[in-house]
C-alpha cells in the first residue's frame, strides 16, 4: 500500500482509538482488568464482543464457548452462574469501568440488541457513543430502524461486497447506518473519501504496527482498532497532534 504523506480530514474531529477486547496485548482479553488498563493507557474507545446466556444475561466474551469438564458448550446454552468468573456481565462492566469512552460492541447474538441498548441506557451510557457492529448488513439495517439513538456499524470485507463499495455505501446511507468498518488491508485513501462522501464514518480494524496506524490516520479514517494501546496512543499523538479525547462524532 502506498503511504499517505499528509493527513486528510476525518468526519470525527478527534478519531476514536479503540482498544480491541481491552488492552489485549497487555492483559487477558475481554476482562475488566484489560478494559481498565486500556483507559489508563489512553484509549478513548473500548471494543468487545457480546453474547446472551441461557438465562438472558449479556456477557462479554469473544469466542462464546465455555469449556468445562472436557466439553465445549455455547454461552447461549449456559446460565450465568455456570460461566467462568472472568467473564463479566454488561452491568458489571459499566459498574466497574464507567461510561466516559466510546464503546464498540460486536453483537454475536442477534437477540441481544434490546438488552444491550436497555442496559446501556439504564447505566447512563451516552448512546451516541455506543457503536453496535454486525457482519450481516441486513441485521444492521433492521436494527437501525428499531434503535434510533445508537450508532450502527456495518462490519464487512471488501471481498464480500458483491455489489461493490459505492452501492454498499449508498445502501448504508439510505437506511441511516452510521459506519463502514473494514480490515485495514481493505482501505485506501479513495475508499475513505468514498465513505465520507456518503456521510459514513470509516472504521479500520486489526492495526498492530505503527506504520499501518500512521498511514490510516493520514487517510482520514475515523476510528482504529488495535491490541497495542500504547503504540496506538503514541501514533495518535503524533498524527492527530494530541492524545485521544472523548469528543463526540460529527
Predicted regions: what is each one?
Residues 7-17, 44, 50-102, 108, ...:
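An active-site metal/cofactor-coordinating segment within enzyme catalytic domains
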Residues 16-18, 45, 102-104, 129-132, ...:
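Structural preference for beta-strand elements that scaffold enzyme active sites
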Residues 20, 38, 49, 83, ...:
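Conserved, mostly hydrophobic/aromatic
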Residues 22, 51-53, 63-64, 108-110, ...:
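Active-site beta-loop-alpha junctions enriched in small/polar residues
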Residues 34-52, 93, 172-180:
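Catalytic domains of carbohydrate-active enzymes, especially glycoside hydrolases
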Residues 53-56, 110-115, 136-142, 164, ...:
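Active-site-adjacent beta->alpha loops and helix N-cap segments on the catalytic face
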Residues 84-87, 154-250:
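C-terminal active-site rim and adjoining tail of enzyme catalytic domains
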Residues 100, 122-128, 145-150, 197-198, ...:
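Short helix-capping segments at alpha-helix termini
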Amino acid at each position: 500500500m502506498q503511504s499517505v504523506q499528509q493527513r486528510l480530514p476525518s468526519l470525527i474531529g478527534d478519531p476514536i482509538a479503540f482498544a480491541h477486547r481491552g488492552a489485549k496485548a497487555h492483559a487477558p482479553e475481554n476482562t475488566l482488568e484489560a478494559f481498565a488498563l486500556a483507559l489508563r493507557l489512553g484509549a478513548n474507545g473500548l471494543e468487545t464482543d457480546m453474547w446472551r446466556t441461557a438465562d438472558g444475561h449479556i456477557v462479554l466474551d469473544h469466542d462464546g464457548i465455555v469449556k468445562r469438564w472436557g466439553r465445549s458448550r455455547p454461552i447461549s446454552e449456559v446460565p450465568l452462574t455456570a460461566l467462568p468468573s472472568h467473564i463479566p456481565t454488561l452491568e458489571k462492566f459499566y459498574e466497574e469501568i464507567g461510561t466516559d469512552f466510546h464503546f464498540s460492541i460486536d453483537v454475536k447474538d442477534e437477540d441481544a440488541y434490546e438488552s444491550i441498548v436497555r442496559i446501556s441506557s439504564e447505566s447512563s451510557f451516552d448512546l451516541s457513543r455506543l457503536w453496535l457492529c454486525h457482519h450481516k448488513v441486513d441485521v444492521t439495517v433492521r436494527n437501525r430502524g428499531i434503535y434510533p439513538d445508537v450508532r450502527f456499524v456495518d462490519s464487512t470485507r471488501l471481498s464480500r461486497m458483491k455489489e461493490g463499495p459505492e452501492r454498499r455505501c449508498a445502501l448504508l446511507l439510505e437506511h441511516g447506518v452510521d459506519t463502514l468498518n473494514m480490515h485495514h488491508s481493505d482501505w485506501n485513501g479513495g475508499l475513505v473519501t468514498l465513505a465520507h462522501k456518503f456521510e459514513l464514518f470509516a472504521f479500520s480494524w486489526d492495526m498492530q504496527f505503527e506504520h499501518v496506524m500512521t498511514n490510516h490516520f493520514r487517510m482520514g479514517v475515523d476510528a482504529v482498532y488495535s491490541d497495542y494501546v500504547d503504540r496506538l496512543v503514541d501514533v495518535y499523538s503524533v498524527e492527530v497532534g494530541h492524545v485521544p479525547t472523548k469528543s463526540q462524532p460529527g
